[in-house]
Every structure is written in structure tokens, then in C-alpha cells.
Amino acid sequence: MEDYRMVLLDIDYVTVDEVPVIRLFGKDKSGGNEPIIAHDRSFRPYIYAIPTDLDECLRELEELELEKLEVKEMRDLGRPTEVIRIEFRHPQDVPKIRDRIRDLESVRDIREHDIPFYRRYLIDKSIVPMEELEFQGVEVDSAPSVTTDVRTVEVTGRVQSTGSGAHGLDILSFDIEVRNPHGMPDPEKDEIVMIGVAGNMGYESVISTAGDHLDFVEVVEDERELLERFAEIVIDKKPDILVGYNSDNFDFPYITRRAAILGAELDLGWDGSKIRTMRRGFANATAIKGTVHVDLYPVMRRYMNLDRYTLERVYQELFGEEKIDLPGDRLWEYWDRDELRDELFRYSLDDVVATHRIAEKILPLNLELTRLVGQPLFDISRMATGQQAEWFLVRKAYQYGELVPNKPSQSDFSSRRGRRAVGGYVKEPEKGLHENIVQFDFRSLYPSIIISKNISPDTLTDDEESECYVAPEYGYRFRKSPRGFVPSVIGEILSERVRIKEEMKGSDDPMERKILNVQQEALKRLANTMYGVYGYSRFRWYSMECAEAITAWGRDYIKKTIKTAEEFGFHTVYADTDGFYATYRG
Amino acid sequence: MSQLSKVEDEILSQVKRFLKHINSNLPEGMELEFEGFYRRGFFVTKKRYALIEDDTIVAKGLELVRRDWAPIAKKTQRKVLMAILRDGSPEKAREIIREVVGRIRRGDVELDDLVIHTQITRDLSEYKQIGPHVIAAKRSLEKGRRVERGSIVRYIIVKGRGPISQRAFPVEDAEGMGYDPDYYIENQVMAAVSRIMSSLGYSTEDMNSLSSGERQSSLDAFF
Amino acid sequence: MFKAELNDPNILRTSFDAISSIVDEVQIQLSAEGLRLDALDRSHITYVHLELKAELFDEYVCDEPERINVDTEELMKVLKRAKANDRVILSTDEGNLIIQFEGEAVRTFKIRLIDIEYETPSPPEIEYENEFEVPFQLLKDSIADIDIFSDKITFRVDEDRFIASAEGEFGDAQIEYLHGERIDKPARSIYSLDKIKEMLKADKFSETAIINLGDDMPLKLTLKMASKEGELSFLLAPRIEAEE
Amino acid sequence: MFKAELNDPNILRTSFDAISSIVDEVQIQLSAEGLRLDALDRSHITYVHLELKAELFDEYVCDEPERINVDTEELMKVLKRAKANDRVILSTDEGNLIIQFEGEAVRTFKIRLIDIEYETPSPPEIEYENEFEVPFQLLKDSIADIDIFSDKITFRVDEDRFIASAEGEFGDAQIEYLHGERIDKPARSIYSLDKIKEMLKADKFSETAIINLGDDMPLKLTLKMASKEGELSFLLAPRIEAEE
Amino acid sequence: MFKAELNDPNILRTSFDAISSIVDEVQIQLSAEGLRLDALDRSHITYVHLELKAELFDEYVCDEPERINVDTEELMKVLKRAKANDRVILSTDEGNLIIQFEGEAVRTFKIRLIDIEYETPSPPEIEYENEFEVPFQLLKDSIADIDIFSDKITFRVDEDRFIASAEGEFGDAQIEYLHGERIDKPARSIYSLDKIKEMLKADKFSETAIINLGDDMPLKLTLKMASKEGELSFLLAPRIEAEE
Ligand SMILES: [Mg+2]
Ligand SMILES: [Mg+2]
């Protein structure tokens, strides 16, 4: 029995002897940066049933031979509710049995039945990826397929967070170049001629079958060896984060297919597993066990507002300089002509160096969101902001003892989509030249409306007797007390942000200030996302009434403020949602 | 200057009074903040405006900087904005435009003020869209100058018939060639200032008369 | 206290239709003698003067002079709501111009007055050597004729004829009218077509327009009510041709 | 088998002009008694009811009840093609509503019926304490008057007057009409101007509108044909003001 | 030297209204016999022929044949400026077509002639087996009827009836007219609705249209002046349905 510490990089589960085993992939950053896979066999999946008749429900559930039943007191949209916590033996049992449970006469509804097992673990244990964990465990022999430098530990005690965030993570970027003389690259016939790799681990190289006169080129015999050398580098370096640009939809699927054709082994996972590409909606997602693969392309689409998202365009926007560009449809000519090939090598290296620079700039915020939302970086980097906000609320609901609403049904989703809340107030600007202009802005208008008016689905009421805040224009009523779930959560976020900003002011350490600044930036993004979620059609806490009330109050506040400003001699010449410009007329 | 400060002080103290009043009535956590004081400004539409703070111009959505503008366009725009925002005189802005247009028409502008700079970011043979900078770069190559990816091409548009692209010449070769007044007036100077002027109530026709050299008089001369 | 009543709202409507396309805001001076307005457009190209005498109104009370600043666009929106047989009543209260139409129903509109510093322009002192009258409709037709080829119009007057003309890229247009008046000195000047269109919206004010013209001088257009109780006039700055 | 003939197509046109701006699709119930329609707009703000009795038609045959679902926009396109002297004949076949206009030529239009599940809304049960009549055109004029300043309208009725009013940023408008009816309890409510405009497209149905009004209650507007053979009515939900 | 005078400008206007929506530029042949024009639209779907005999004009002089090429859009702009009682005078000078309207004022317009190579199209030789007459207005109404459901129109003629019809996604339309003429061989063909709309702008030329129709053959539409002094005719290529 030993104490272990490691930064949690990734998480999944496997089945061993019919038992689900949570696997925690991490590195001992305090020690020698050793990779560790920790196994936790103590966790079981569960869902909640809301009974119409508690005793009858317990009786009916007994007959289903479930692992364990437990009556709990929870809240459903604020209302105290007795629920039955139903534990299963294995995560795969949940989808098989939940419909039978839902259909029982004595069951009104089931909840939290579609939360992936590994996410459930992170939520219930209150641990978050990219933070340091500590636990007691016993080191065991690794399975034969596990790479030799990885230690396997069986968790025996409680897994908890030390509260220390990870810094100085190892990042490696990669990019492939394909020789495709006939249109779009086709992995069935167009070979990969180069793979570039670069990172903050003192490594910048292009692996290829040619170019031995160039000092940054590592020459290999053929394409198969090229692929195996790339795999070797990843396994050997074991970066915490492997980044590509459009690598989910292009580089990794292409590599995988070429490797299959050539018979090359690409067992990049810590456990010896292969690269695995999954469908996620309309996109792909490529996972490597233990190494977090981040595709920067979707991250940049979310982060920036540009006309195009080519690597060149993004790089120019971030760093204000141009990088080397070659026409994609004619790269093969550069490869085929000796006098042009060196330029292709420089271009390939430039691609991975640029990708790495982008990663260094943009990943800190994503790491901070990872810690806040509490889901793996692999997932966070592929989530829309609304999804991030939703998983944040799921985590908070667990802490508050609040049942998580189900996702909308298909018909609910369809009917919701047609509706849109009216936006903020805009006063079209007065044309012409104005003198002595003052600019006023509300600080966090919408979040503070949610908090001060207690806008939440659980506080929304038809009860005329309750003491309520009543929304302008629509007349929706929100109980003044108790504090609603979402207002409470937003209040926490804003308070935490204020605390961090105070801490920044009091710190003399530039590195600490930088870290704190990223933290407050992440909180700001989360808070800004939070007020819009009521209007997202797929959102579990969707409420058109709440969304409409927020903007209605927003319009009301700014209009009243403009009117009051007139009394003080300020004439508004232009207003937009949460701010206005006014001239002083005495 | 002291008169200006006095006005500003009065306004800022009224701002303080107003904010104190309004914030005392807002819910906790909500706050109306003072974001800035500007001597002058104009708004075109939402998200499109220009303001001046001391001698610094704050502009949004007005396309104030485009990399393919010649110095004469940038300078004229800057002067126009200053006339409007610092001096408070749209009329002075019109005079600036009229004066610049007149100098361009008379051939009275130095070549340095007419040079357009553009960076070449790929092989010349790979450009699908053959813009003026590509034509000028090719002409430079033909003269034996080195032009490669990353090079800055400096060219002017000369007089003549045909598309603008075909009249792009490297500035090194343009000595003695006459520049095209219509191009520099319409595509450079007027393009740089017309949106600003229209936001102040000047119509397209007013701007056309400025660029044509024909002048719409005002009644001021008759008062 | 100000109150003015009128059986025919058209006079107000036709006047302000022209005025609102020239200026966004006007100051109207109310006095015992009547209602008066002088305004200069933003670019100082067009000047407009309106005078409606107290005698024009069926009932007129103005026991102390008053100046009100009105948004012309808002005013026009209200005046357009008048019906043919409505009686219109104008008055003011603290902060509003009140317009009431009495017909089948009583319809009351309040237009917010604008609180601005307003310096009333004085009309420029211009001596003209000639003056002639043309049918208003002929003037409107000439503008529409020239509009198909050009955005500027040349006005000429000689001893016999008033001529409006223009030359464009695709064609030319010319309108000749025998004015039958004494013209001592021929004159010629060029004007913006759009600016003249704005002035000519006042087509119910009078059936004829009095024109004063001089070489490269502002155009003066005057509309007088047959009853002499109202006058609407405009000055339009010329366009000066470039030196070649 | 269903067949209905009418000498005057205007009744159909004016009814469906209003209905089509409120709902995209309607179910029309055809029976021996006549033609009936109840519909609720998508946002559940406006309810519309139409009844055209068999007696209204010159010839009417409906030997078994039928429900047809029609796209109102397509129906309006056809009805707009009627000429003043056309005789209009309505019938159905498998999958179509057939409209025929007989005049100088015979013009036949077939509109595809819609195959949807349609739950006919029931009118809400509302008790009103007062009812009064106003000229339809006055109502239309009031809407246009208020439109220049506001997007909502306040209706009030007291023992003497019906008042429509609004206050906007740039001005106010108010229309007063002496209704000459007995009103037991004054009432006041606010409505969306756009929604009322939709209802008032039915201006050839009747020269007067019957209004039921209650404090913060839906507006009920009823148009009855002089012959009693048809009725078109609307319910419009009020806008609720926030407590200050 | 060419000069033509006409008391009624409407003939010119209605002719060129149709022509200008079909072709951008036309060549007009001026000769002692009169004015003639043949044009084929850019996509070679519609052919138009206009003939205005010298006798149509009150005064007509053309002492040597001349061909002028005119932009139809510019010509229409000028013709639209004619007033009901204007006398219109056409002439040419070096580079311009001159149109003068004499009324209360003399209004002179010069339209720049176009300097282009122009090959006058010859009308295709087509034999038709049948011919019938329909009121022009009925044709226009049919187009508007079919427009609500379709962008193509089927014309059929049999021994008794002329039928215009179309089937669309949302409905069908059919117009039947008893023509009362001898038809030897029934015919059917489909045409583009937009193209027919262009032709039917010439609605003041004649009250009736003569139609020649054949199976999948071009539609021939002829408008003859009652006085026989002018003729405007069109040929429209059919739409050929794909083999099923
Ligand atoms: Mg790539
Ligand atoms: Mg690349």
C-alpha cells in the first residue's frame, strides 16, 4: 500500500471479468514524470427513478434483480422529491434495462440515465482532469501490451484532488504531407511522403524518405517505416498532449488507413491499443489511450471569428505574421521535382512549428475550462460552449442534490427550434457629428439579471400568491426565494472570479498572475455562456420563459437607464443591448 | 484648452452624479459603468462608429485600414477624421478632400504617396486571381529583380485604357509614366473617405461632385 | 397659450412634405402674426422659408411668442394621417406639439419637442435681375424628363423662353416654355436634380411657382397662396462647373 | 359530395385574407349547415372563427360532413383571381379543393388538400361584461394612426367613449369615438398592433365591428354579415405590462 | 431626312414596352413605306416583328432609307414621359434619335444611337393549320391565373374551345374560352409563362390577339391595329417536354 500522486490526463473504463474498471491515465509530475494507469474497481453505474408510488415502485424494481436500490431525498427543479437510486452491475446494463424501468406503472420518470460512466465517475468523485490526484494503491504487473515505462496501480483508497493544477505540460504537434497527383488525397493510392513533428520537448523534425542533406530531416527507408517511426516517437516521447490541425478528419484517418494497407503497427496507446477514430455527430474524433489528442481546428473555430480557418489564416491572426503557404493541390509537384522538394520540407516543418505555437497560445484557456467543467480535455476541446455549460451544471446539480433534467425528446426539440427570444434593445444611432460623448456600459448585465431576479426554471411559477419578480412585457413570475439553481451557480462563478481578480492584484509573481488571469478568463467565458443556455433547444435546462425574461429585463433596464440619463442631461445617441453613448446637453 | 477642460470637468462630475444615482437603484451585482469620454464622434450604424479621445481615434467597423491603400488615401482619411473629430468641422473635411482631389487631377502628387504595397505570399504562377500586385511582380521579374514568396511589391497604377490590373507598374519603372488620376481619386481617396462623409449626412451626389471636380456650392458664399 | 384651427389639413401637409425632405429638424416660430419657419439643410445647399399668416387659420390664438423645435419626419407621419374632411387643431403643451383631427372620431397626436440649441438662419441677401412665373406642374414634369438622362439640370431664361435641359451619357433632354414675361438679362445656372425634387414636393401649395434666376446664382423658388395668407420659398445653391 | 355556389366572391376573399395572415393552414368543416372554421395561430395569441351558413350560398349541397385541410396562402392566391362579375363554385374531389370562376371564360383551380393530423381548437370560454360597436374603418384608421408611434395599442372603453391610444418614444396618439352604447364596467387592455392589423384585413365582411373588452382580457372582435348568414370573429390575447 | 409626327404617343409606347422586355437593342428600318423592326431575343426563344405604316402618321417624310440602332430601355424611358395630349415628333440627326413632345411646353429628347454591327433576323417560315382570335385581356388574365401555380402554361385548341392550363405542386389551374371559330386540327403546346408575360405588355395595341397554334410548334401571336396601319407580332418557341 502506497501513496500515489499524478496529474489526471484522461479516463475511460474497461471490463475485466464482467466487472467495469475505471482507468485513470496520469503522470507523476512531482516525481520523474512517470506515466501511470490507475485502476478503480469500486465504482458502479446508477440511475434515478421517480416513483408515483414509492412502495409499489420498490416492489416492482425488486423483481428486476438489480444490483442495489436505495431511497434518496433529492430536488427536482427545486421541489423536494423522493427518488430511488438504482445501481447496476455494468454500464452496458443501463440501456438494456432503463426502458423497462421507465415503463413500470409505478415509475413516473427516470433521470440521469444517459450520463457516460466515466463522466459519472468524475462527477461523483469530485475530481477533475488536468489536476493532481492523490490516492492509495498497490502497484501490480502491467498487462503485456502496456508499454514498458507505464506503471499499473490498483486503487485501494479514496481518489481525491490535491487542488493543484497541472502546468508545464508536454506538447507535441504533428502534420502529414501526402503526394496526390490526381485530385483529392486518396489513402487507397496516394502515399504519405512526410510527417512533421515539433514540440516544447526540444524536438523539431520532418520524417521522410528523402531530404538527407537537410539537418532537420530524419530519413527513413519507405512509407511503412515512416509511419512506424512516427509511432515510435509518440510512444517514446509520450507527450501529455498531441496536437494536429484538422487531424480528426484528415491526418489520423489517413494515417490509419495507410498503416492498414502497408501492414504498419500503430499501437500508440499506453495500453498498447491502436489509434481509434469515432464518429461524433458530423465530425470524427481520434483518441489515443493516455495521450490527449487535441485537434486545434474546431478549437479555433470556436475561439475566433474569421472568414476562413486555414492554418495560415489562423496563424496570421494570432501572431500578426504570415507563414509559408504552398498550393495544396500541387504539393505533389514539389515532391516530384528535385529543385522544389527542399521548399516542401521547409513548408512541412513550418506547418508543425506553427501548429505548436498556436497550441501554446490557445491551450491554457482550454485547460482551465477542463478543470472548471470537470470533463477530459479530449472532450472539452471538441465541445460547443453550450455543452461545456451543461456539463458544468450537471456537476453542480450533483453537488446541490438537484436531479438533472432529461434531454429533450425529438418532438420537444423540433417544437423548441422554431422559437427565439427577442434580443436586446437597440437604438439606431443618430447620424451626424456629436460632441462631448460619454460611454456607459452595464457590467455583466445578463448574469446579474439572472441573479437579482432569481430567473430559473425551478423558480418559475404560476402561483399568484407567491412573492415574485415579474418579468416586463411577458409577465412571467419568478419566486423571490429560495435561490434558484442556475442563479446560485452563476453567483458562485462571479464570486469566484472576483476573488481571483483580487488575488491577481495582490500577487507579485508574474507567473502566478498569468495563471490567475487564465483562470478568471475561463470563468468569464463560462458565465457569459451560462445566460444564453436557457434558449438552446437541446439544453437540459432549456426554458424559453427564462430566456425571454432575461432579455425583457435587459431591455427594461437599459431603457429606464436611458430615460434617467435624460433627466441628468445626457441624451442617448446610440444604444445596443447593455451600453449606450450619450451627449451631455445640460 | 482650459475652456475645453472646464466643459469636460462639468460633464464628468455630472456623470459621477448620474452613476451614483442610477447604481443606488440597481440590484446587487449589476452596475452601470463609465467607459469613456470622447470629445467628438459620429455613428454610421450600430457597430460602426468613430470617436476621438485626446488625439487618439477609436473606430469600429469603418474599414479604416486596408492594406492596399496608398499613402495618399491613408493620409487623407486621417486628415478627414481629424477635421471632423478634433476640429469639429465637416466643412473642413470637404475642403481637404477637394484639395487632395485637385492635386491629384493636376498631376501634383509625389510618386511615394501613390505607391501601393502588397506582400507576395505564394509563387507567382500559383495565383489564380491575377490582381494588380501580381502583374506588377511579374513586371519586376522581367526586369531582373528578385521576387519571391514574402517579397513586398511596390507599384502604382498608371494612365491608360484597360483594366486596372494591367496598368500596375513597379514604382521603380514608373518614373515618367503618368499615374491614373481617376483610379487614385475613386478607388483610393474617395473609397477611404466616402463612408465617413456619408455618415455625416453628405449624399452620394455630394461626394460625386467632390470627386468630379465640379463643385456643388453652398449658400454660405451668399450670406 | 397657442391654438390654431384649420378646416383644410392639406396646406400643412404639402408644406412639410417638402420641408421634411430638406431638413430633419426645424424650429417653428409661433407669434400673434402667425407661424414662421426658416431652415438650412445640413450641407448648407438648400434654404427653406415658410410663413403661414394668422388669417389663414379659422381660429388662431398665440398670446405670447414661442419657439418649438420639431422632428420633421415625425411631424409628416402625423400629417399624413389627416382625412379630407378633418378639421385640424394645433396646440402645444409642456414638451409636445399637439395635433388633433376632428372628424368621425377625435384623433389626438402628441409629437415630442426637441430640446436643442437652434440658431435660426437668416436668409442670404441676394439681388436678382429677373423674375418669371411658370406652372408648378410644368416644373415637376421637367424634372422627371431630365431625370432619365442626368442628375443635374441647367435652367436658362431669355427674353422669350424658360429652358430646362441636360446632357447625359445616353441622351439629352430639353424643355422649352414661353413665359411671356419681361426678362432684362438672360441667365443660366446648373442645379442638382435631387435637391430640386425635394423642393417640388410642395405641389399643393400653389399652382404656379415664381422663379428668380441669375448666372451661377442660387435658384429662388417662391410659392404664394392665392389668398396671400401663406408663402413657401426655397433657395438652392448652384453647381459650379470645373475650370477646364 | 360537396358543392357551393356564390355570385359574389368577395365574401370568401375578405374572410381568408384575414385568416391567411394569422394561420398557415386551416381545417374547414363542411356540413349541411354550412362552412365552418376554427383556428389558433402558432404562438397561441390569436384565435379565429369563421362561419358561412348554407343560406348564404345561391346553391349549397353537402350530403355528408367533410373536413378539409387547406394551405391558406394557396387559397388566397386563387381567391385573388376572382373578377367582380364572376360566379364562384366550390367543390371537392379526392385530394383537392376545386374553385371555379364562371365569367367570360370558365376558370378552374384545384388546390391540393393537406394530409395532416389536425386538432380543431375549441374557443376559450370568456365572459365579457360589456359590448359595443364601432365602424370598421374607424378601427383601421386607429391602427394606422397608432402605428406611427408605437407597436402596441391600448384600448379603453367607458360609459361614453371608446379610446385607442399609445405612447411612443417620439410621440403619442389617441383616438376617441363616442359609441352611444351602454357600458356597465369600464375596461382597459393592451394589444399587439401587428396582431390587430392581421385581423383587420377582413374589411369587406362587415361595415361595423362588435368589440368585447375587459381589463387585461383578450380582445374579442366580431364581424357579422348584415344578412346574418355569416360571422367572422377573432380573439386576441392581451399584452401584460410588468409591475413598476 | 426623316420626320414622323403622331397625335397619339400611346401606339409607340405600348409597342416598345413589349419589345424592350424582350430585347435590349433593336434596329429600326426607316423607309418611305414606314417604320419596321425585326428582333430576336438573346436566347433565341422569342421573335418580335413591328410594322408601323407611313399612313399611320399624321406627317411622314423619309426621303432615303435609314437603319438606326436604339437601346430599347432608353427609348422606353423617353416614351413614358409623353402626356395624353402631346403631339409626338420623331426625327434623326447625326448620332441621335430625336423625340419631341409638343404640348404646354416643347420637350425635346435625344437618344444616342448605337454603333454596332446588326444582322436583321429573318422570320422563320412556319405553316400553321389553324388560327383563332381571343380577347387580349382574357389572355392576360389567363397568364395571371396560371402564374399562381406554375411557371409554364399549356395552350390547347379544339373545335370549340381554347384552353389554357397548368399543373403545379400546390394546385392546378385551367381557363376555357369558347372561340366560335373553325379549327381543322386540334393542337397542344407548352410555353414559358415569363416569355408570354413579356409579349402581353403590348395591351394597348389591339383589343384582340390572333393566335396560331400547332403541336409542339412556336406560338404565333399577332396584334393588328383596327386601322390596318400597324402590326405587332411575336413568335415564341415551345417548351419541349422530356421523353418519359
Ligand atoms: Mg495538414
Ligand atoms: Mg501541412
Swiss-Prot record, chain A:
**Which domain of life, per UniProt?**
Archaea
List the EC numbers from the record: 2.7.7.7
Q: Where is the signal peptide?
A: none
Q: Which SUPFAM superfamilies match?
A: DNA/RNA polymerases, Ribonuclease H-like
Per UniProt, activity regulation is: DNA polymerase is inhibited by replication protein A (RPA), while 3'-5' exonuclease activity is not. Polymerase inhibition can be overcome by replication factor C (RFC) and PCNA.
What Pfam family is a match for this entry? DNA_pol_B
Q: How does activity depend on temperature?
A: Optimum temperature for DNA polymerase is 60 degrees Celsius, functional between 60 and 80 degrees Celsius. Exonuclease activity is higher at 70 than 50 degrees Celsius.
A GO term, aspect molecular function = nucleotide binding
Q: Write out the entry's keywords from A to Z.
A: DNA replication, DNA-binding, DNA-directed DNA polymerase, Exonuclease, Hydrolase, Nuclease, Nucleotidyltransferase, Transferase
Q: Name the chemical reaction catalysed here.
A: DNA(n) + a 2'-deoxyribonucleoside 5'-triphosphate = DNA(n+1) + diphosphate
Q: What is one GO biological process annotated to this record?
A: DNA-templated DNA replication
Top-tier EC class = transferase
InterPro entries for the chain: DNA-dir_DNA_pol_B (IPR006172), DNA-dir_DNA_pol_B_CS (IPR017964), DNA-dir_DNA_pol_B_exonuc (IPR006133), DNA-dir_DNA_pol_B_multi_dom (IPR006134), DNA/RNA_pol_sf (IPR043502), DNA_pol_palm_dom_sf (IPR023211), DNA_pol_type-B (IPR050240), RNaseH-like_sf (IPR012337)
Carries keyword DNA repair?
A: no
Function, in words: In addition to polymerase activity, this DNA polymerase exhibits 3'-5' exonuclease activity.
Assembly and partners are described as: Formed of a complex between PolB1 and PolB2; the exonuclease activity is associated with subunit 1. Probably binds replication protein A (RPA).
Family named by the database record: Belongs to the DNA polymerase type-B family.
Q: What else is known?
A: In some Methanobacteriaceae the PolB protein is split over 2 genes.
Q: What is this protein called?
A: DNA polymerase PolB subunit 1
Organism equals: Methanothermobacter thermautotrophicus (strain ATCC 29096 / DSM 1053 / JCM 10044 / NBRC 100330 / Delta H) (Methanobacterium thermoautotrophicum)
Q: What is the lineage of its organism?
A: Archaea, Methanobacteriati, Methanobacteriota, Methanomada group, Methanobacteria
Q: Which gene encodes it?
A: polB1
From Swiss-Prot, chain B:
- Specify the superkingdom: Archaea
Q: Write out the catalysed reaction.
A: DNA(n) + a 2'-deoxyribonucleoside 5'-triphosphate = DNA(n+1) + diphosphate
> What does its activity-regulation comment describe?
DNA polymerase is inhibited by replication protein A (RPA), while 3'-5' exonuclease activity is not. Polymerase inhibition can be overcome by replication factor C (RFC) and PCNA.
Q: Which gene encodes it?
A: polB2
Gene Ontology biological-process entries: DNA-templated DNA replication
Q: What else is known?
A: In some Methanobacteriaceae the PolB protein is split over 2 genes.
Per its UniProt record, what InterPro entries does this chain match? DNA-dir_DNA_pol_B_multi_dom, DNA/RNA_pol_sf, DNA_pol_B_thumb, DNA_pol_palm_dom_sf, DNA_pol_type-B
Q: Keyword Hydrolase: yes or no?
A: yes
Thermal activity characteristics from the UniProt entry: Optimum temperature for DNA polymerase is 60 degrees Celsius, functional between 60 and 80 degrees Celsius. Exonuclease activity is higher at 70 than 50 degrees Celsius.
Name the UniProt record assigns to this protein = DNA polymerase PolB subunit 2
Q: Which GO terms describe its molecular function?
A: DNA binding; DNA-directed DNA polymerase activity; exonuclease activity; nucleotide binding
| Functional summary from the UniProt entry | In addition to polymerase activity, this DNA polymerase exhibits 3'-5' exonuclease activity.
Q: How does it assemble?
A: Formed of a complex between PolB1 and PolB2; the exonuclease activity is associated with subunit 1. Probably binds replication protein A (RPA).
**UniProt-listed Enzyme Commission number(s):** 2.7.7.7
Keywords for the protein's UniProt record, in alphabetical order: DNA replication, DNA-binding, DNA-directed DNA polymerase, Exonuclease, Hydrolase, Nuclease, Nucleotidyltransferase, Transferase
Curated annotation (Swiss-Prot), chains C, D, E:
Q: Which GO terms describe its molecular function?
A: DNA binding; DNA polymerase processivity factor activity
- GO BP terms, alphabetized: leading strand elongation; regulation of DNA replication
Q: Keyword Transport: yes or no?
A: no
The UniProt keyword set, sorted, is: DNA replication, DNA-binding
Coiled-coil residues are none
Sorted alphabetically, which Pfam families does this protein's record hold? PCNA_N (PF00705)
Indicate yes or no for the key word Phosphoprotein.
Answer: no
Q: Which PANTHER family match?
A: PROLIFERATING CELL NUCLEAR ANTIGEN
Subunit details for this protein? Homotrimer. The subunits circularize to form a toroid; DNA passes through its center. Replication factor C (RFC) is required to load the toroid on the DNA.
Q: What is this protein called?
A: DNA polymerase sliding clamp
In the UniProt record, the gene name given for this protein reads pcn
